[in-house]
């Protein structure tokens, strides 16, 4: 089966304090995207699509694109590498962005930007997260049997394993019944308190550590692009479309489609642990975890 890995790498790492997508954190300077690409190809994915800003093309080719192009699938074929640009040229002609808008329009728009490049089942990930080897195998297996219309999948993680002591995080808090997602709420300020309590700072609600959350590890078929276009255009026509900061988010779109009965989402689970770099202070821990994975043979001495 042909399947694509779509990597969202155009976002600005404001909370991290720089461009965390291109920060070499592995023992030989590997960036987190390289681990995602390596794991996906091992799982069976044979195309990689990087969503970037146009001025990132040369940098992305050097940091990860060439590495991806040098990989081979299980049957010895080269991995196809493509680049999708998330910028103003991907906006509809009838829309004029508000003055001062420099921020990307969010993850739903990012995935929509790959429409002309992706014609097979695909997995979407963040560029700055480590999801684990098993997550890609699990998703690839799910995509082999996913219906062409009205169905999707996601890999869920326990909230307690996705928070940081260095500040608040944004997570898609999920409600799951019989293995399917029934609701997802993008919660923007989740804090880990000194006593281990996890709280939504906006509402004061205490969240259970075993709450399933989305880390933007999604599986879709190309039929999702029609839904993405409709949702994004509605966003642009709304008051949010005139904001310089509002974002059109993928989890929010999924939640709306669930509520309308237009999408069924299977919730998958991975045996591996997620980790990532929301803040610069997270970097040392991530680097230590990656060293352990190389030392225990999960990865070769060097990925490149």
Predicted segments with their positions:
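N-terminal glycine-rich phosphate-binding loop and ensuing alpha1 helix
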Residues: 1-71, 120
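Hydrophobic packing residues within well-ordered alpha-helices of enzyme cores
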Residues: 60-64, 139, 228, 286
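Short phosphate-binding loop-to-helix
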Residues: 69-121
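Short beta-strand-to-loop acidic/aromatic patch adjacent to the donor-nucleotide binding site
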Residues: 120-130
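Conserved core of the sugar-phosphate nucleotidyltransferase
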Residues: 133-218, 222
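Conserved active-site beta-strand element of glycosyltransferases/polysaccharide synthases
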Residues: 219, 265-268, 276
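A C-terminal functional module that forms or caps the active site or interfaces directly
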Residues: 229-263
């Amino acid at each position: 089966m042909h399947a694509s890995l779509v990597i969202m790498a155009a976002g600005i790492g404001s909370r991290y304090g720089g461009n965390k997508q291109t920060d070499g954190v592995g023992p030989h300077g590997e960036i987190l995207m390289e681990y995602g690409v390596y794991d996906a190809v091992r799982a069976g994915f044979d195309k990689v699509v990087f969503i970037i800003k146009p001025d990132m093309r040369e940098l992305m080719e050097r940091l990860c694109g060439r590495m991806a192009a040098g990989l081979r699938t299980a049957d010895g074929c080269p991995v196809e590498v493509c680049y999708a640009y998330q910028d103003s040229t991907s906006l509809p002609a009838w829309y004029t962005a508000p003055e001062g808008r420099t921020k990307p329009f969010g993850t739903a728009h990012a995935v929509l930007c790959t429409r002309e490049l992706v014609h097979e089942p695909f997995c979407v990930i963040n560029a700055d997260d480590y999801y684990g080897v098993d997550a890609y195998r699990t998703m690839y297996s799910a995509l082999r049997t996913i219906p062409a219309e009205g169905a999707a999948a996601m890999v869920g993680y326990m909230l307690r394993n996705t928070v940081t002591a260095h500040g608040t995080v944004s997570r898609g808090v999920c409600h799951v019944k019989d293995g399917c997602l029934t609701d997802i709420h993008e919660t923007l300020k989740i804090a880990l308190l000194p006593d281990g309590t996890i709280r939504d700072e906006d509402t004061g609600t205490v969240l259970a550590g075993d709450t399933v959350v989305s880390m933007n590890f999604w599986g879709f078929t190309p039929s999702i692009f029609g839904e993405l276009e409709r949702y994004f255009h509605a966003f642009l026509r709304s008051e949010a479309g005139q904001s310089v900061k509002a974002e059109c988010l993928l989890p929010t779109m999924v939640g709306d489609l669930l509520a309308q009965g237009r999408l069924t989402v299977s919730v998958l689970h991975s045996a591996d642990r997620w980790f990532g770099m929301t803040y610069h202070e997270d970097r040392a821990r991530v680097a230590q975890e990656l060293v352990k994975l190389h030392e225990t043979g999960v990865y070769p001495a060097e990925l490149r």
